[in-house]
Amino acid sequence: MSENRIRIATRKSPLAMWQAEFVKAELERIHPGIVVELLPMSTKGDVILDTPLAKVGGKGLFVKELEVAMLEDQADIAVHSMKDVPVDFPEGLGLEVICEREDPRDAFVSNIYKSISELPLGATVGTSSLRRQCQLRASRPDLIIKDLRGNVGTRLAKLDNGEYDAIILAAAGLIRLKLSERIASFISAEESLPANGQGAVGIECRTNDERVKALLAPLEHLETRYRVIAERAMNTRLEGGCQVPIGAFAEIDGDEMTLRGLVGNPDGSEIIEGVITGPKTEATQLGVALAEELLSKGAKSILDAVYAKA
């Protein structure tokens, strides 16, 4: 492999392509003269669009094909939305860089209403996320929640066609695709705790590829890494995939980190919450400790029931 060339495996969706183009531009800015190629490909999660994600099953629905490309030396790196990245990596691959986080909140999108509280009784809301569903149902049990799949453009088109009164999307994706004007309101973390890693972009590569690791190093954002590592550690201890009713959100103030976590029954009947504060340098330990607290409050029975239905 030329010292001056790097190949990026990416999903084909507009948001995934934005993320890959962002990393490409950063590499070109930091390393003038470098040649960066994009290798768009489809993943299982992109192909199976007629089934709720929780029922498709498995971890890594949106990353496996990209990982195979790296292991077979067809690509050097893969760029991921961190909330799609499984907790375990195939032997020989690892998460090398976590880039600076975009807004991690959920966004309320509607052509008629300004916020969840404005929705009339029995309104129809679209979201494919069990995490969002359980929090919505807990606060508004009257709402009709329908599954919503496809890329951002497809989801917005379904809203515009009148299939839903409102939909819930990650704010980061809309901001990155220059669709901020579609956001009727941002949903606070208190109202809808985000998914672990939401809004962050991660870069995976071969663990023994020192050339690529050196090229990627300047893209690392340490504060984002601390936050995402804590959130992922909690998720790992809970044995959660990317399609489970788990929320995790870390914030940093100076050297202190506050991590909030949530496990909920998708029907909204029970939500178990916890919060922990400690040194940001102990991100992994904080995540594990919070998971243990949630498990001690009964989170395992909720998650076991979800996995049994999937």
UniProtKB/Swiss-Prot annotation:
Which Pfam families does the entry link to?
Porphobil_deam (PF01379), Porphobil_deamC (PF03900)
Transferase as a keyword of this entry, yes or no, is: yes
From the UniProt record, which GO molecular function terms apply?
Answer: hydroxymethylbilane synthase activity
Free-text cofactor note: Binds 1 dipyrromethane group covalently.
Q: Which residues carry this modification: S-(dipyrrolylmethanemethyl)cysteine?
A: 242
Q: Which Gene3D superfamilies does the UniProt entry name for this protein?
A: Periplasmic binding protein-like II (3.40.190.10), Porphobilinogen deaminase, C-terminal domain (3.30.160.40)
* UniProt entry tagged with the keyword Transferase: yes
Task: Give the keywords, sorted.
Answer: Porphyrin biosynthesis, Transferase
> What are the BP-aspect GO terms?
heme biosynthetic process; protoporphyrinogen IX biosynthetic process
Question: Transmembrane region positions?
Answer: none
Q: Quick one: a GO cellular component term?
A: cytoplasm
Per the record, the coiled-coil ranges are none
Catalyzed reaction equations:
4 porphobilinogen + H2O = hydroxymethylbilane + 4 NH4(+)
Q: Which Enzyme Commission numbers does its entry carry?
A: 2.5.1.61
- Obligatory cofactor(s): dipyrromethane
Q: Which family is this sequence assigned to?
A: Belongs to the HMBS family.
Q: How does it assemble?
A: Monomer.
Q: What else is known?
A: The porphobilinogen subunits are added to the dipyrromethane group.
What the protein does comes down to: Tetrapolymerization of the monopyrrole PBG into the hydroxymethylbilane pre-uroporphyrinogen in several discrete steps.
State the protein's name: Porphobilinogen deaminase
Instruction: Name the species this protein comes from.
Output: Shewanella oneidensis (strain ATCC 700550 / JCM 31522 / CIP 106686 / LMG 19005 / NCIMB 14063 / MR-1)
